[in-house]
Amino acid sequence: MTLAFDIEARDPHSRARAGRITTAHGVIETPVFMPVGTRGSIKSLTPDEVRNHGAQIILGNTYHLYLQPGHELIARMGGLHHFMGWDGPILTDSGGFQVFSLVYGGIADEIKGRRPTQQVQPGMVKVTDDAVIFKSYIDGSMHVFTPERSIEIQKGIGADIILCFDELPPFHAGYDYTARSLERTHAWERRCLMFHRATQEGGLPFVPPNPYQALFGIVHGGVFPDLRRASAEYLRELPFDGLCIGGSLGENKQQMREVVDMTVPHMPDHLPRHLLGIGDVDDLIECVARGIDMFDCVSPTRLGRHGTALVRDAERRWKLNVANAALRDDPTPLDAWCDCYTCRRYSRAYIHHLFRAQELLGIRLVSLHNVAFLLKLMRTIRQSIIEGRFAHLRAEWLGI
């Protein structure tokens, strides 16, 4: 075992639990939300800013870091921790999500019923039982990802937790295609595990040995209960350090939660569980209640760039448009519950002005607020589980 996971408290009314994951770069208290640093940075924010607002772990995207600047360069620079100036734990995805999202769109697209907006050229992605062949979105060059190649790249990046390479079928895929895809993904996960263990003590020319690097498997099966169960039961027999719920999560929030409901009971209790790509306020609370320990999502900074601030207001669906004219003379902070730098120092009126004037500071302040808001939410959830108040928190925030 290359990381330790200890469960400290459980909620008697749900599957919610509070725990601690110990890694080589520090302890992660769960449930936890990790900001996403797609290309080695959390957009518009410094590592110190997110650390000082409570970030414990961040996620890096293997696909993007492989294409630019390249995993071998990152390895020569001492790994992603040293390269980007972040001294806490890092998790990297496998690259599969981004490759398949070029064709099918991402998790957020599925749940909101959107089709991919990026124009995909013919031949941009080809899938075989052995590998995925794709064109770089940067220069059109051709690249091949095998399970082994994905693990090699992630080892070069040097994350504390790495993920298996997997196929991402779309939510509209039928049962037969999803079942075939699941077989392929399970074969790829076995290959990832074998290569990871064979190279953990060394053997890659540009990567120092890292016996503390953990590998998570990914449960697939689309929206089909028997496939989700089969995947979870298959993976729990393999020596992974944790498991993710990935693949298609359905076409709306309710279906996503049903996928979590049908999957978690078949996952090992002693391993951390990560729900990939989910970060809305209500989803975080509801999926903690369903037994999820770890979350990641690009939404806090993406919303920030587009002038949307997270607020504690279910009637607004947790979102406030800072460019709204009603905020022009509003002296209050973005959110009275939040204690981030933005909310301590600036008014809604000032942030409204920044966005209307197209000042970059506006993007930074709202992005920082959004990240800090979710990080505080997760700390509050964790404390409520430890103190036996999670059911009250759930009712208070969601009105249920």
Curated annotation (Swiss-Prot):
InterPro entries the record matches: ArchSynthase1/Queuine_TRR, TGT, TGT-like_sf, tRNA_ribo_trans-like
Any single GO CC term annotated in Swiss-Prot or TrEMBL for this entry: cytosol
Highest taxon of the lineage: Bacteria
Subunit details: Homodimer. Within each dimer, one monomer is responsible for RNA recognition and catalysis, while the other monomer binds to the replacement base PreQ1.
SUPFAM superfamilies: tRNA-guanine transglycosylase
NCBIfam families recorded: Q_tRNA_tgt, tgt_general
Cofactor binding remark: Binds 1 zinc ion per subunit.
Binding site for substrate: 93-97, 166, 247
Keywords annotated in UniProt: Glycosyltransferase, Metal-binding, Queuosine biosynthesis, Transferase, tRNA processing, Zinc
EC class name: transferase
Pathway in which the depicted protein is active: tRNA modification; tRNA-queuosine biosynthesis
Annotated spans, RNA binding: 277-283, 301-305
Signal peptide extent: none
Lineage start: Bacteria, Bacillati, Chloroflexota, Chloroflexia, Chloroflexales
Protein name: Queuine tRNA-ribosyltransferase
Keyword Transferase attributed: yes
Active site: residue positions: 93, 296
